[in-house]
Amino acid sequence: MLNTFGDTFRVTTWGESHGKALGAVIDGCPSNLPLTENDIQYELNRRRPGYSLFSTPRKEEDEVEILSGIFEGKTTGTPISCIVYNKSQQSKDYTAIKDTPRPGHADLSYQLKYGNYDYRGGGRSSGRTTIGNVIGGAIAKKLIEYTHKIKVIGYTTEIGTIKGDFNYYNNPEFFESDLNIQKLSNQIEDSVLRCPSTNSNEMNEYVFKAIDGKDSVGGVVEVVIYGLPKGIGNPIFNKLEGRLSSAVMSINSIKGFEVGKGFESSRLFGSEMNDEFYFKNGIICPKTNNAGGILGGISTGAPVVIRASIKPTPSISKTQETVNIKTLETVPIKIGGRHDPIIVPRVIPVIESMVSITIADLMISSGFINPSKLSNI
């Protein structure tokens, strides 16, 4: 089982949903980066359960403790180790279904591959393990913003069959200045679904309807990388979009990924899809950004635009059919415990984290960030 992501900026995550604790070890972060537990806690608070209208009732504070790698408020270049203790497990909720793999979950595939599987809350396959992703992502996000003022911002564009009216292509002006991006960030965080669209209330009603029907819903998240320099990524087998898709698709519940116009580009003429170039203050710029900031696997300097589709939460209160792996019989199953009717808004900081880790990794390996130490900026 591979638990480490990255080449030069490496994040190793560990822990299970109902274990004693979870955490991450970050290796390859340069020294001299100002970093506190508050930097990490802010991102963990955005991901944590039990504190929003559509979140699981399982309340966890998810308080992070930095164990190593920081001295006098700055990174030392040594591994940064962080831990978060679980405090609200209810493992008894899973005893009755330990031999009956839950539809839509990784129970069966983990059992078949590893045999000894921690069934409590999904164990290592649980979405709760993304705490480690967010710890690493918080540090990566701080690094790329501190050194190059790069911002990674995600938001909901669709919930179920309801499409929002806000996206990068409808509202490019929001990504033209730091001030506009801050305004957008405030709008996103003020929304229970992290959706800046004017019809987000319609999405809320859609989720309520699913809850009433003992069901769950999914959605689509768009992420924009603002301020990424030209020249990040490599052609052929190490393309920027390939690295980003690998990072995002590693997250539980992600079932689709696209860049720029994505699948819509297959329905356009070349004359509609191509981004023409012009000079702006002596710099070559695209008139449009249908490519999503990437050409030939390399960043163009325009905002990088990606989207990910998130499946409905597999734990639902409806009775379903499964099998008992001990008796070899088909049996009904009804999932108890505490679960999210929708995980889209909580997945957004996880996607931002994996994107930030990828960008930090590439910025270091491409020579944009000194791998040893940062100068006083």
From Swiss-Prot:
Cofactors: FMNH2
Catalytic activity: 5-O-(1-carboxyvinyl)-3-phosphoshikimate = chorismate + phosphate
GO molecular function, one term: FMN binding
Cysteine pairs bridged by disulfides in the record: none
Pathway noted in the entry: Metabolic intermediate biosynthesis; chorismate biosynthesis; chorismate from D-erythrose 4-phosphate and phosphoenolpyruvate: step 7/7
EC numbers on record: 4.2.3.5
GO-annotated cellular components: cytosol
Family the entry assigns: Belongs to the chorismate synthase family.
Role noted for this protein: This reaction introduces a second double bond into the aromatic ring system.
Protein name as it appears in the record: Chorismate synthase
Organism annotation: Methanococcus vannielii (strain ATCC 35089 / DSM 1224 / JCM 13029 / OCM 148 / SB)
Gene from which the chain derives: aroC
